[in-house]
């Protein structure tokens, strides 16, 4: 499970960690790992808080922090699921677009640009912003889908992005 984005409170890393803890406590889902990918851009106090939360929940073996990735397609390529947990509306919501363009299922908060780029339950899933239980339930729903359903969601997501953001529409 990948959460890309710079480390700042409104990108939702805290709720993501709380969600991973809720998922980890369950015994009815397959084992998983989570990656928080993004630079703290000098916000080391916030990163220390996040690392403390990971330690408090004993998730050190489950959640990995990666500061940067020069090749984001590679990061998306290793993910089975991408999350965008913003607690404040983003004008565009690049993570949702990038995940869909890579054919990876996306679970995103129901505010901002993601609501316009995701076709709900067809190219991705939306959860109530700031609600770790809603995010947990959305991730469980994705984890319980079969391989063909996930491939279909990924394929529909890619088609959606190619249709909405082709060169002619973006440059003319």
Predicted regions and their residues:
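Short acidic alpha-helix that forms the nucleotide-activated donor recognition element
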Residues: 65-79, 101, 119
């Amino acid at each position: 499970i990948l959460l890309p984005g710079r480390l700042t409170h409104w990108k939702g890393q805290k709720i993501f960690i709380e969600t991973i803890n809720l998922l980890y406590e369950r015994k009815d889902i397959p084992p998983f790992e989570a990656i928080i990918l993004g630079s703290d851009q000098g916000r080391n106090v916030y990163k220390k808080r996040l690392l403390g939360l990971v330690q408090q929940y004993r998730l050190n073996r489950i959640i990995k922090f990666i500061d940067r990735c020069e090749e984001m397609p590679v990061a998306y390529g290793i993910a089975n699921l991408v999350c965008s947990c913003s607690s404040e509306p983003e004008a565009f919501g690049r993570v949702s677009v990038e995940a869909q363009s890579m054919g990876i299922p996306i679970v995103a908060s129901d505010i901002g640009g993601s609501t316009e780029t995701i076709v709900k339950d067809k190219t991705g899933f939306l959860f109530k912003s700031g609600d770790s239980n809603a995010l947990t339930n959305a991730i469980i729903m994705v984890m319980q889908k079969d391989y063909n359903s996930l491939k279909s969601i990924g394929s529909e997501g890619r088609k959606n992005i190619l249709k909405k953001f082709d060169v002619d529409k973006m440059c003319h």
